[in-house]
């Protein structure tokens, strides 16, 4: 636990504009100025029409799919994982690995340059909903809840992005 807290202290936190996060996994903090207005301005009713009930629960209400239930957990195809809500590219299959946790795991987000995630499709937000701090991962374009990132992944990044399959859309590489 102490190792996790030390790792979280070193990560940049993003501040919030406006509305509070709903559901059990959010701290209510949001980033400023990095979200595309057209993607995040959909109403709750519009998201419910666009998404399946499970996709809506996970991405818009900050839920979590059951471990070992996701369609991409054992996917070994080469390609890119996109946001199911807005189609933003998020993770490459090149950085996917088996963590044994029951969710697809990635060592870094697509577009990362070392520790610089400014060119990725994700944002990190502190999540204290379960009584201990952890880092939530959301889509930069539409604020979809994707999962969490933990400091116990493989080298060289040491990160484990633990992502809900239902929040992703896989696009295989063209041969």
UniProtKB/Swiss-Prot annotation:
InterPro entries noted in UniProt: Met_Sox_Rdtase_MsrB, Met_Sox_Rdtase_MsrB_dom, Mss4-like_sf
- Active-site residues? 162
GO CC, alphabetical: mitochondrion
Keyword match Magnesium: no
The Enzyme Commission number assigned here is 1.8.4.12, 1.8.4.14
Under the heading SUPFAM superfamilies, the entry gives: Mss4-like
Q: Which keywords describe this protein according to UniProt?
A: Metal-binding, Mitochondrion, Oxidoreductase, Transit peptide, Zinc
Gene Ontology biological process terms from the UniProt entry: actin filament polymerization; protein repair; response to oxidative stress
Pfam families recorded: SelR
Where is the MsrB domain positioned along the sequence?
44-173
Cofactor(s), by name: Zn(2+)
Q: Name one GO molecular function term.
A: peptide-methionine (R)-S-oxide reductase activity
Identify the residues that bind Zn(2+).
83, 86, 139, 142
**Catalysed conversion reaction:** L-methionyl-[protein] + [thioredoxin]-disulfide + H2O = L-methionyl-(R)-S-oxide-[protein] + [thioredoxin]-dithiol; [thioredoxin]-disulfide + L-methionine + H2O = L-methionine (R)-S-oxide + [thioredoxin]-dithiol
Region annotated Disordered sits at: 22-46
Report the transit peptide positions: 1-42
The cysteines covalently paired via disulfide bonds are: none
Main location group: mitochondrion
Activity regulation information from UniProt: Inhibited by high concentrations of substrate.
Q: Which domain of life is it from?
A: Eukaryota
- PROSITE patterns, from UniProt? MSRB
Q: Where in the cell is it found?
A: Mitochondrion
* Function comment: Methionine-sulfoxide reductase that specifically reduces methionine (R)-sulfoxide back to methionine. While in many cases, methionine oxidation is the result of random oxidation following oxidative stress, methionine oxidation is also a post-translational modification that takes place on specific residue. Upon oxidative stress, may play a role in the preservation of mitochondrial integrity by decreasing the intracellular reactive oxygen species build-up through its scavenging role, hence contributing to cell survival and protein maintenance.
Similarity comment: Belongs to the MsrB Met sulfoxide reductase family.
Protein name according to UniProt: Methionine-R-sulfoxide reductase B2, mitochondrial
Taxonomic path: Eukaryota, Metazoa, Chordata, Craniata, Vertebrata
């Amino acid at each position: 636990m102490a190792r996790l807290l030390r790792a979280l202290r070193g990560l940049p936190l993003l501040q919030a504009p406006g509305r509070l996060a709903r559901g059990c996994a959010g701290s209510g903090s949001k980033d400023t100025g990095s979200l595309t207005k057209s993607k995040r301005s959909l109403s709750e009713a519009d998201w419910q029409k666009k998404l399946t009930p499970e996709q809506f629960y996970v991405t818009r209400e900050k839920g979590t799919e059951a471990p070992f239930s996701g369609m991409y957990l054992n996917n070994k195809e080469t390609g890119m994982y996109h946001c199911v809500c807005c189609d933003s590219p998020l993770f490459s299959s090149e950085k996917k690995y088996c963590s044994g946790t029951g969710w697809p795991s990635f060592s870094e987000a697509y577009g990362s340059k070392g520790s610089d995630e400014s060119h990725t499709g994700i944002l990190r937000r502190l999540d204290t909903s379960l009584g201990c701090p952890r880092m939530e991962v959301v889509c930069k374009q539409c604020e979809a809840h994707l999962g969490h990132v933990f400091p116990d992944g493989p080298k060289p990044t040491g990160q484990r992005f633990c992502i809900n399959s239902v929040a992703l859309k896989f696009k295989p590489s063209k041969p």
